[in-house]
Amino acid sequence: AMALVDSEELSVDTEASAASLAHAGMEVDLGAVAKGFAAREAEAAIRDAGGTSAMLDLGGNVTVIGTKEDGSPWRVAVKDPRDTGSYLCVLALTDVTLSTSGGYERYFEEDGVRYHHIIDPETGYPADSGLLSVTVVSADHLLADALSTALFVAGPEEALDFWRSRDDF
């Protein structure tokens, strides 16, 4: 299966609005950005309809538009991956999206081993980066969604180095 994992084998023709993969059996999984895309489109529809205050919760991706009706920021809790009934912190947010990726909700167990859904493209197995979850806050929905997954796979040191090198999340 790893022979079929290579993003360089995806060809995109923007003029024709077409994409192709080099080998039979290859697939594109948009799971790392699908909710970000949906949130972006939903926010645009709300704003186009005149909406100025809303919270969209897409399960792991939360978008806040404006402030609450009383003018205060939206308060968004970040789940504790060790105890999903509680939270690590509560963030006061306005006009941003928050995306959390982790292996604590979508998984299966086989022979006493837990396998979560975030795959490391280098190994073909669930990412084992030492992180339990990553939360990214940004005005860019797709960026937040993609980075929460990518930084989860990357691990703590690489994720922190990347975060320190940027100013857009």
Feature names for model-found ranges:
Residues 1-169:
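Mature catalytic core of soluble alpha/beta enzymes
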